[in-house]
Amino acid sequence: MISSTSVYGLKMQWTPEHAQWPEQHFDITSTTRSPAHKVEAYRGHLQRTYQYAWANDDISALTASNLLKKYAEKYSGILEGPVDRPVLSNYSDTPSGLVNGRKNESEPWQPSLNSEAVYPMNCVPDVITASKAGVSSALPPADVSASIGSSPGVASNLTEPSYSSSTCGSHTVPSLHAGLPSQEYAPGYNGSYLHSTYSSQPAPALPSPHPSPLHSSGLLQPPPPPPPPPALVPGYNGTSNLSSYSYPSASYPPQTAVGSGYSPGGAPPPPSAYLPSGIPAPTPLPPTTVPGYTYQGHGLTPIAPSALTNSSASSLKRKAFYMAGQGDMDSSYGNYSYGQQRSTQSPMYRMPDNSISNTNRGNGFDRSAETSSLAFKPTKQLMSSEQQRKFSSQSSRALTPPSYSTAKNSLGSRSSESFGKYTSPVMSEHGDEHRQLLSHPMQGPGLRAATSSNHSVDEQLKNTDTHLIDLVTNEIITQGPPVDWNDIAGLDLVKAVIKEEVLWPVLRSDAFSGLTALPRSILLFGPRGTGKTLLGRCIASQLGATFFKIAGSGLVAKWLGEAEKIIHASFLVARCRQPSVIFVSDIDMLLSSQVNEEHSPVSRMRTEFLMQLDTVLTSAEDQIVVICATSKPEEIDESLRRYFMKRLLIPLPDSTARHQIIVQLLSQHNYCLNDKEFALLVQRTEGFSGLDVAHLCQEAVVGPLHAMPATDLSAIMPSQLRPVTYQDFENAFCKIQPSISQKELDMYVEWNKMFGCSQ
């Protein structure tokens, strides 16, 4: 049996399927119901009848629009009607009142705001009486126990976004469509939806049949309509004569728990429970096609997605709006870290892999590109939050050093942080993280036993002057790019000895456990400028260690008064930043046999250095390698040579090494040299140290600048300079001479034969 009814002259048919909802809504004709319950009833009717019938094409789009306006009029009339209310609240019996209309047995909520302080709204006084006949004739009976937001055949626990529908104090939600360039939706609700066979023809805005006092008095004027956008769906040229309902904002508090009825801002109903599967959702049209319900703006910035077209646009809009209602559109990614955790279990030594470039593989010690750049970049540790709270009220000298980190201030800058920011990685909770940052951490049985001396190191740190710690950090600890064996020209014999007798026992202490003592001190002697410091940096890079560079001449000339304390602080920080490589240049200044005064500053400095060196050599816990360099090995006291287990001669570069140095230095400039000229340069640089060859190339590169006319050098472009030629090297040979005499070379050879270990 099919029944029909007429609304606004349009016929609306009802199928037997609509009879499956008997007694699902409130009895609107009841005179004992409160306005809150009647409001819920209209919302239930709107959702279960109008929307369902529209979705199943049981009623036309024009009929749906008329019903929507009719229900909105009655809904707003209930809220604005002069009905006696016990309290002025958000239309619930109590603060915990249910939005589905069920009775709540708790006591009424008594807010601080009373009804006397509210401006009365008598815009539709007779709407309740007029709505009884209209609703009863158009809609089937409903049950008051049905929960708002559910539909037949769908679980009741599926929630939908809440759509505010009252203008009297309701809170309008920003529309997703407000930012579309082709659809300028107002912040309020414009609830006109037409079928796809109709077009968007603007209709004249008719005056509201129930104007509010504010509108009638001229205090509140509706905003001018926006310009009409282009038609979305062609095919219908008729003009709608539907009225425009504009309700002003009243003084009722915002309703945050209003059930889903119709959406503010012109947003279509989201895909939810009331739409059966397989039924397409209605297509929304701009607000200017059929004037709808214009609500006062709320001042919030609406979400403005990119422009969408065709049917996929509407589905994406509904999906985005639904996700926003469910709280799935959170774009705050600042609280999440996407860094991949690195494993703490990595082999200490691996055989070389020829498939990896030299810049990344080093000499085969399994050094990754990421960690190798941090090989000897020691830094100050930022205190953890717990340690900051623990030590915030104490003085800097009483601080217990927190864990070690690897970020450092720029070299040479004075730091104001306390010395208490240093500690040994083995005693900190971030020790494993520290070892991950090292390309080849010195691991072995001694690492487990290192915790026994942590307490003594902590006590010494507490008693160390902050100025000395800052001095060591800024002046002695050196950072720079990692150095590979291929970066050092020549010295093949020295490299092989260092690898086999220094690096391998340190990296694989388990394989060399039978040795009485591991070689932890090295003496590099030879002419100046032959690469001794570069070798020290390379050893630190291969070990993944912190590189400390102490100049013996600087201790004597610049810091003689504090040299003893600086040496002590350097070894102390090195123990906190293990593994460490301490490089001491001009060691003959500290260990000279000519120092006779027992209490002189130089004597105290030498005593402190020997004491620290002896501790490193005899301790199985310290992961420290001490490398000393000198150009005057004959001046070292004979009794002190025993402290250096390996004494290696660093000779002048051979012809192959000199050719490599010249090519490397000229690769950054434009030059014009053939193979014969390169061979002549290599031959003429016999007896030159590596530093002398560098000075020669630098002087030759400046030659093209000397040939330029006397103009401003800043205005000269590199392309305007001529290439470097052999003639430039001829001119440079007139200014640069070898800095090493043959007598000195003979002395190095003789001393190496007597005390050296490289042959």
Curated annotation (Swiss-Prot):
Any Pfam family hit: Vps4_C
Key word Zinc-finger present: no
Tagged with keyword Plastid: no
Main localization, broad class: nucleus
InterPro entries the record matches: AAA+_ATPase, ATPase_AAA_core, ATPase_AAA_CS, Fidgetin_ATPase, MT-severing_AAA_ATPase, P-loop_NTPase, Spast_Vps4_C
Biased composition (Polar residues): 381-418
Phosphothreonine: residues bearing it: 400
Descriptive protein name: Fidgetin
Domain of life: Eukaryota
Organism: Homo sapiens
GO molecular function: ATP binding; ATP hydrolysis activity; microtubule severing ATPase activity
Subunit description: Interacts with AKAP8 (via C-terminus).
GO terms under cellular component: centrosome; cytoplasm; microtubule; nuclear matrix
Matches recorded under Gene3D superfamilies: 1.10.8.60, P-loop containing nucleotide triphosphate hydrolases
